[in-house]
Amino acid sequence: MVAVKHEASGSLDVILDKVRSVGPRFRERAVEAERANRVSDETIADLGAAGVFRIGTPREYGGYELPVAEQLEVITEVAKWDGSTAWVTWVGATQNWIGVGCGPQVAEEIFATTSKGPYLAAVGHLPATRGRARRVPDGWIVSGGPWPFASNALWTAWSNLGVIAEEDGESCLAGVQVPRHQLKSLDDWHVAGMCGSGSNSVALIEDEVFVPAYRLVPMSEVATAARGIELEGSLWRAPNLGWGFSTMAGMSIGLAEGVLQRFLERASGRPIRGTSYQNQLEAPPTHRLLGEVHTKLRAAKLMTRANAEATDVLGHRAASLSPIDPEELQEFNLRVRLEAAEAARLCAEAIELLQRNSGSTAIQESEPIQRAWRDARVVTLHGALNLEVLFENYGRLMAGLPPHTFGGIA
């Protein structure tokens, strides 16, 4: 294993201070990022200098490997300033488990780099993937695509693409590691929210690409790290759903906190049209509004923080060889997704209340409130956060019925 040395401190407080110092730049660049459909290379450099791409990276490769609860704080802080920048941060922190789960050789390729940007883009790990792989001597031939929603593929050296791998008449969903120089990014990220995340589709430059055998791993093995973990940290034994979705909810929380701060700034001394109130902050309707926003935001934060901490606890248990009961893990996986979706909904509703009471000037392109309003709705639309489906699935478990499964995961 080749360790990569970094001089910067990895403490949570240091990283948060760095994010706060560059946060205003993220907000200033947001309009241009939306027009370009991607954050700028300067923003990627600022994130890298702040250390955010190493918060979920193995210590053995110079990463900070922060606990999930601390990663949640970093992602929340970035989201206060800009949603698209937070999305890039979230993906950059939480997809590293896929690289680790693919085994030591793949992890070595991904993390043994001096790059200060994100390490890995992971996309299309769904049964409906358009990617295909067929077995040949010494490896696989990959074809098909394109792969949509390839967040961070603009900046990573590697992308892990979902494929249906076929061998000896049998098939499975797998992840295959492809270097950036064999891929092209399609200009198809034209969306209503998270516009600057640069989540374009990617496609193979050639019709077919050969990859060595070790770079293709069934997703069932990736999810359980069946290829063996040489890393010491408990993060790599924590439930990946808890890691991914509790921190995802952190984006919604940060967006809501940023809008609340912006609302208070705008409301000070602002008259409410159609009333005798000359200062919105002194008006009783505002006080009721703020109280309602507080309850929604606090509920979201309490659920999300509890799930992040529980993820860390389960990781420590697994690292100490204390087995996690399968039924306990199933309940946790169902609950963390449901509560992440509910937290995202509560935060989107809080932002909606603040937006609706910010006046018509809040719809200006330069106004962070309207941007966060759109970005927060995008989080609620993520395919894994379908609240109605998640309500049903957890309710089935409560009623003693087997939950629905997706790709073998409840």
What are these regions (language model features)?
Residues E331-S366:
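Charged, glycine-rich active-site and insertion segments that engage polyanionic ligands
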Residues N200-L297:
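Glycine-rich beta->alpha junctions and the first turn(s) of the following alpha-helix
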Residues M1-D17, S21, I409-A410:
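Basic/polar N-terminal segments that are highly enriched at the extreme N-terminus
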Residues D41-A49, R54-W155:
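Glycine-rich flavin
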Residues F149-H190, G198-S201:
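A short core secondary-structure module
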Residues R20, G254-E257, Q261, G291-R298, ...:
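Generic structural signal for well-ordered, non-transmembrane alpha-helical segments
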Residues S358-A410:
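Glycine-rich phosphate/cofactor-binding loops in nucleotide/flavin-utilizing enzymes
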Residues R288-E342:
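C-terminal structural cap/anchor segments
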